C-alpha cells in the first residue's frame, strides 16, 4: 500500500478544497494519505496525531499543493530524506508542479498503480564565507541570487570560475542557477533556457552596468566564487530558492558548486520540457489578455 505524504499551502488552497480531493482520491485508490494533525483536524479527522516533522519519514512519495514557491519549500523538506516529490499546481505558472488541480484523481491513480517516473534533478551547494569562516550554507534547487540590499546602489561582484577571475559585475546582482532554475528569475533577467536533465551551472547578471555583459554557462564540475567588493559599503543579500535569505557585506565570499544530492521529482504527464515551456508561457500570455 503506497503511503503518500501531503504538504498543502493553506493560503492557496482555500478551505483545503483540493487537499480534500487529494486525500479522498488516495483512499479511493487504496493508498494511505498522511497529513499532519493540524491539517487532519481541519479535514475532520480528530484522531490523527502525526507531527509535521514526521510526515516525510512515514511516506513513500510526497505531494505538495500550491505554486512553485510551495514546491521549493517542500523540496527542502523531502530531498534530505531522498523521497520523490510531486507538485499539484494551484498557482499561476507552476513550472515545477506536474499536475493540474483538475487532474488530481487521475494523478493519484497513476501514483498508486506505479505508473510514474522520477527525474533526478541537479542541485547546488552554496556557502557564505566571512573572514575565512563559513557563516551560512544551504542547498539549492533553483537559484542563488546575490542582490543589492534596501538601498539602491550599484553592487560590485568579483566573479571567479575555479579561482580563475572571470569578470567584475557592477549592477543589481548575479543569479547562479541550476538547469531547473533556468525558467525562473534567470529567465526574467535574460538568461538562457536549459533542459532540466543537463548538468551545468548558469550565471546571469542582474541589470549589469556594462555594454558587453551576458549570461554564461559552465560545466557542473566547476566552482563559482563571487566576492562582494570591499568598496561595497552597503549590505547585500543572498537569497536561496526564494526561501532563505542571508545578509552579506563587502569582503564576503559566496562559493557555489554542484551538490552530491539530487532532487527526485515525480513525473506523470510524459510531456517533454519544450511542450511544458510552450504551454506555460502561452497560457500565461493568454490569461493576461
Curated annotation (Swiss-Prot):
Parts forming coiled coils: none
Q: What Pfam families would the database entry show?
A: NAD_kinase, NAD_kinase_C
* Co-factor requirement: a divalent metal cation
Reported EC number(s) for this entry are 2.7.1.23
- Kindly state one GO CC term assigned in the UniProt record: cytoplasm
Could you tell me the keywords of this UniProt record?
A: ATP-binding, Cytoplasm, Kinase, NAD, NADP, Nucleotide-binding, Transferase
Residues recorded as binding NAD(+), renumbered to this chain, are: 68-69, 73, 142-143, 153, 172, 183-188, 243
- What is the protein name given in its UniProt record? NAD kinase
Its source organism is Acetivibrio thermocellus (strain ATCC 27405 / DSM 1237 / JCM 9322 / NBRC 103400 / NCIMB 10682 / NRRL B-4536 / VPI 7372)
* Chain's gene name: nadK
Amino acid at each position: 500500500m503506497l503511503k503518500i505524504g501531503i504538504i498543502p499551502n493553506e493560503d492557496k488552497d482555500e478551505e483545503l478544497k483540493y487537499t480534500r480531493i487529494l486525500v479522498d482520491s488516495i483512499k479511493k485508490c487504496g493508498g494511505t494519505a498522511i497529513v499532519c494533525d493540524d491539517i487532519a483536524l481541519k479535514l475532520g479527522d480528530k484522531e490523527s496525531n502525526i507531527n509535521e516533522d514526521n510526515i516525510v519519514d512515514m511516506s513513500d512519495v510526497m505531494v505538495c499543493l500550491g505554486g512553485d514557491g510551495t514546491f521549493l519549500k517542500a523540496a527542502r523538506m523531502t530531498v534530505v530524506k531522498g523521497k520523490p516529490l510531486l507538485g499539484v499546481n494551484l498557482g499561476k505558472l507552476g513550472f515545477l508542479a506536474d499536475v493540474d488541480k483538475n487532474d488530481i484523481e487521475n494523478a493519484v491513480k497513476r501514483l498508486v498503480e506505479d505508473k510514474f517516473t522520477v527525474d533526478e534533478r541537479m542541485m547546488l551547494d552554496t556557502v557564505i564565507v566571512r573572514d575565512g569562516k563559513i557563516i551560512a550554507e544551504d542547498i539549492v534547487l533553483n537559484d542563488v541570487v546575490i542582490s543589492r540590499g534596501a538601498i539602491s546602489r550599484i553592487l560590485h561582484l568579483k566573479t571567479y570560475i575555479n579561482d580563475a577571475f572571470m569578470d567584475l559585475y557592477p549592477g543589481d546582482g548575479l543569479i547562479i542557477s541550476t538547469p531547473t532554475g533556468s525558467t525562473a528569475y534567470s529567465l526574467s533577467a535574460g538568461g538562457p533556457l536549459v533542459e532540466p536533465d543537463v548538468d551545468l551551472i548558469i550565471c546571469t547578471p542582474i541589470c549589469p552596468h556594462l555594454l558587453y555583459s551576458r549570461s554564461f554557462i559552465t560545466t557542473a564540475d566547476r566552482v563559482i566564487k563571487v566576492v562582494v567588493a570591499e568598496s561595497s559599503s552597503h549590505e547585500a543579500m543572498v537569497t536561496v530558492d526564494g526561501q532563505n535569505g542571508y545578509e552579506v557585506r563587502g569582503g564576503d565570499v559566496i562559493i557555489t558548486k554542484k551538490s552530491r544530492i539530487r532532487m527526485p521529482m515525480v513525473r506523470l504527464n510524459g510531456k517533454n520540457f519544450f511542450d511544458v515551456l510552450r504551454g506555460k508561457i502561452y497560457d500565461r500570455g493568454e490569461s493576461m489578455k
